[in-house]
């Protein structure tokens, strides 16, 4: 039981690491506040076409949610997933060409 509580506490504490741009940290904070109760909501860091992108994936609270991808200057780069099951980002299939670097945050 103690190990479970420690693991749960650790997972709940996953948040912005210090190496994220300030504008991304601000967006993560807002996303956490609005998506905290939405199972499946995540923030992930990707390498895509030589760039670092941050993916904000809606959880189950948004029935047709997808992943909004932002660059390091917080520009909305593209949107994938959603009800239309979009895969193309900047001319190529995002899911086939992106490398997931880390999970920054997961809703409980």
Label the predicted regions.
Residues 1-4:
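Positively charged n-region of N-terminal signal peptides that target proteins for export
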Residues 12-15:
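C-terminal motif of bacterial Sec signal peptides marking the signal peptidase cleavage site
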Residues 17-19:
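Bacterial signal peptide processing site
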Residues 27-47, 57-66:
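Short acidic, Pro/Gly- and aromatic-enriched capping/linker segments at domain boundaries
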Residues 56-57, 80-81:
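Short linear motifs in exposed loops
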Residues 63-79:
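A short, surface-exposed beta-strand/turn
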Residues 81-108:
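C-terminal partner/receptor-binding element of secreted or periplasmic proteins
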């Amino acid at each position: 039981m103690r190990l479970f509580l420690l693991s749960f506490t650790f997972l709940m504490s996953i948040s912005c690491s210090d190496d994220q741009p300030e504008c991304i940290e601000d967006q993560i904070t807002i996303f956490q506040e609005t998506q905290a109760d939405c199972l499946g909501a995540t923030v992930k860091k990707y390498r895509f076409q030589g760039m670092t992108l941050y993916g904000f994936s809606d959880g189950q609270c948004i029935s047709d949610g997808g992943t909004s991808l932002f660059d390091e200057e917080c520009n909305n780069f593209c949107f994938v997933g959603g009800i239309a099951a979009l895969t193309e980002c900047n001319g190529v299939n995002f899911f086939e060409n992106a490398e997931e670097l880390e999970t920054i945050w997961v809703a409980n």
